[in-house]
């Protein structure tokens, strides 16, 4: 029998009891159990995603969330914890290029400022002022998407200005509404994101305290508020922010000096061989001398000299003789050198005639010594 016929045949006084019986029907019980089962499954999957996040398997975490349909505005509205996990994972993810195209598209839709999904997500996140750290992650993700997705400079500049305006407005709302429950660490982080990530990174400008003071000029209540909030006993949020800017400036200067020093060192090493004697013999003598010095030092420290194929003295003497020969052939055996040598020889012979007598006895002495020299050489050869 149809349900309408049953309702028509029931007496009026029994309608309430019939409705009561209908509520206790197995169909409704099964429906409740089905809903509970779905919720249990969703909780299990969410816990699995959380475990992947804790293990720093961020790519797998995001892929799992996409697979089960968690990256959806309806899901975000009904379960903010899923949204918090998604934003945190996207914030940690180094680059979206490692993700699949479908997942990339879902992420870009959530964090691209003018998309309907981003507008709805922004309403959910920025509406809960108590979650400032999650809000900061959301802004960092928007910055990351601007860098990742926009190659046109003009479009990137427009999106940067739009994000700058959104962040400035939110800072004003936050310090106005959260006077007594301000998250000082989160607020400092938010201001530094605005300065270093938006002003410096996206606008491609050098850090300067003027960036902070320009924001304070736009938001007159900002500086007095930050001066009155302390991170520690003697350091206010404003002091910490200005110190961070100064540290960033000093680091940039140090990097710049390091690069310049590296260039100078490369130039020095490139020209260094030209500063020394270009002759190969000079280099050989220096190498031999260095080898001898190192050998002596090792001999003093260990008491034993390293074994070598050639004697160090022989190498040093041979190298020295090569240099001397090279110098002699370059300096003496030329026209001027020969002329000067000849004149000196004539003067010596003329002044010291006694030398001639010595030269007369040289052949006889040589014939006398020659057999002994030959015998000595044969003896050395036989050893």
UniProtKB/Swiss-Prot annotation:
Residues 1-331 are cytoplasmic. Residues 350-383 are lumenal. GO terms for biological process: protein import into peroxisome matrix, receptor recycling. The chain crosses the membrane at residues 332-349. It is found in: Peroxisome membrane; Endoplasmic reticulum membrane. It comes from the Eukaryota. Changing residue 22 to F/S: No interaction with PEX6. GO terms for molecular function: protein-membrane adaptor activity. It is a single-pass membrane protein. One of its GO terms (cellular component) is endoplasmic reticulum membrane. Phosphorylated. Keywords: Endoplasmic reticulum, Membrane, Peroxisome, Peroxisome biogenesis, Phosphoprotein, Transmembrane, Transmembrane helix. Peroxisomal docking factor that anchors PEX1 and PEX6 to peroxisome membranes. PEX26 is therefore required for the formation of the PEX1-PEX6 AAA ATPase complex, a complex that mediates the extraction of the PEX5 receptor from peroxisomal membrane. Present with 1070 molecules/cell in log phase SD medium. Interacts with PEX6. Interacts with PEX19; targets PEX15 to the peroxisome. This is Peroxisomal membrane protein PEX15. It comes from Saccharomyces cerevisiae (strain ATCC 204508 / S288c).
